[in-house]
A protein has these predicted regions:
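Beta-strand-centric surfaces of beta-sandwich/beta-rich domains
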Residues: 2-116, 123-263
Length: 263
């Protein structure tokens, strides 16, 4: 008879802590992985997210978001994206999410008001299997599907927003175990500076870690002791290039733990 060989994990004798968290086996522990790219960072620090530009502008107050697409095929019965999941934090920094039915270039308001936008992803799509245009979450006047102020977006072909930034929910402490910067620019003698920045509630952004590398390389930082971030702290990866125009990607891994397990 064939013999079944059970692994240590299967028999329950040992399993890595990080895997237990990812499997939802440890109460009040959550796993968070963030990544984003800025296709053209400047000579001063730029936030690494797919909205580009220099530094990301956060909402000053919780606001209803307008969800729209640059393409008319992203609609409830279209060939592109039909519904998207929006996730973020409310005015009290509590986690909230909702599913929004798209209406092409016409904006659809969220039910919730968001103080922080975390991510957005396509849930259902038509025959195309993907979003036909760029999908936006923002505020202000919407022109051809593009809001005046953008807080998050899904790039065509990705089906999910990308951003190397995140805010710690109320009642939790976040612990960063690693972060990475990668530059795809192979032009010789271009130097990339990476920065991990955080802003405590009511404070200003300060640098927590930095790196330097030549373009076309990656820099991985694994913390021997995880870096702790208090509730309501904004966290983001930034990069600068000695010559403007470099594409830089950033990613980080966090485990966030409830401060009072009895709450």
């Amino acid at each position: 008879m064939p013999v079944t060989a059970w692994s240590i994990t299967q028999s329950g004798r040992y399993e890595p802590f990080e895997l237990q968290v990812a499997r939802g086996q440890i109460t009040w522990h959550e796993n968070q992985f963030q990544f984003g790219v800025n296709q053209s960072v400047g000579t001063s620090f730029s936030t690494l997210w797919n909205g580009g530009g220099t530094l990301y502008a956060y909402p000053s107050a919780a606001t209803v978001l307008k969800i729209s697409s640059s393409d008319t095929n992203d609609t409830s019965a279209g060939t592109g994206a039909r519904t998207v999941l929006v996730n973020g934090l409310d005015a009290s920094y509590n986690e909230i999410s909702e599913t929004v039915i798209l209406n092409g270039q016409t904006a659809v308001n969220t039910v919730n008001s968001y103080l922080r936008f975390h991510y957005m992803e396509v849930v259902t799509a038509g025959s195309g299997g993907t979003a036909a245009g760029t999908i936006y979450a923002g505020v202000g006047t919407v022109t051809s599907g593009v809001p005046a102020t953008i807080y998050g977006q899904i790039t065509i072909g990705y089906n999910a927003s990308t951003s190397a930034m995140w805010t710690v929910p109320a009642g939790y402490t976040a612990y960063m175990t690693s972060c990475t910067w990668t530059s795809s620019n192979t032009t010789a003698n271009i130097a990339i500076t990476g920065g991990l920045f955080s802003r405590v509630y009511g404070g200003v952004f300060t640098i927590e870690s930095t790196c330097k590398m030549l373009a076309g390389n990656s820099f991985d930082r694994h913390f021997d002791t995880a870096v702790a971030f208090a509730e309501k702290t904004d966290i983001e990866l930034r990069a600068a290039s000695s010559t403007a125009g470099s594409a830089v990607t950033g990613e980080f891994h966090i485990i966030y733990i409830k401060n009072d397990a009895n709450a």
